[in-house]
């Protein structure tokens, strides 16, 4: 993804966040801090590509994407944290919290930007 695509997807996320998620305390990660993309924003953007037709994404795929901006990244944990801890409705194969898709242990899927993670409390 190039800078323009990242910004377009992030702006879409911001719109949905303001309309559906902010009221529940779901935190929107900053796109940039000190001129650099944040890892959390990049992971969220990558998971939201082609919304609402989002794809299942592996941890390895996320790590490769983040390495374009942070070359020394060894392991990306942000997808898991954005889900259960921050309220984004991201299913994880490790948590086995998706009943509609069969996800392996190292896969994630953004379910929707219109509802927060089930059971999330800010």
PLM segments and residue spans:
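Minor-groove-contacting beta-hairpin "wing" of winged helix-turn-helix DNA-binding domains
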Residues: 95-111
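Short hinge/loop at the helix->beta-strand junction immediately C-terminal to the helix-turn-helix recognition helix
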Residues: 88-89
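General nucleic-acid-binding
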Residues: 1-8
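Short amphipathic alpha-helical interaction segments
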Residues: 70-85, 94-95
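Short, amphipathic alpha-helical interaction segments positioned at domain boundaries
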Residues: 109-122
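Short acidic, hydrophobic short linear motifs in intrinsically disordered regions
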Residues: 53-67
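Short alpha-helical segments that sit at the start of domains
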Residues: 11-48
């Amino acid at each position: 993804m190039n800078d323009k695509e990242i910004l377009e997807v992030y702006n879409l996320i911001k719109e949905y966040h303001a309309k559906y998620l902010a009221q529940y305390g779901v935190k929107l990660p900053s796109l940039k801090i000190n001129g650099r993309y944040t890892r959390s924003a990049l992971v969220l953007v990558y998971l939201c590509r082609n919304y609402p037709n989002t794809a299942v994404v592996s941890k390895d795929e996320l790590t490769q994407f983040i390495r374009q901006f942070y070359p020394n990244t060894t392991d990306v944990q942000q997808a898991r944290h954005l889900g259960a801890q921050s309220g984004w409705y991201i299913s994880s194969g490790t948590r086995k919290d998706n009943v509609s898709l069969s996800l392996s242990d190292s896969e994630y899927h953004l379910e929707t930007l219109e509802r927060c993670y089930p059971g999330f409390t800010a």
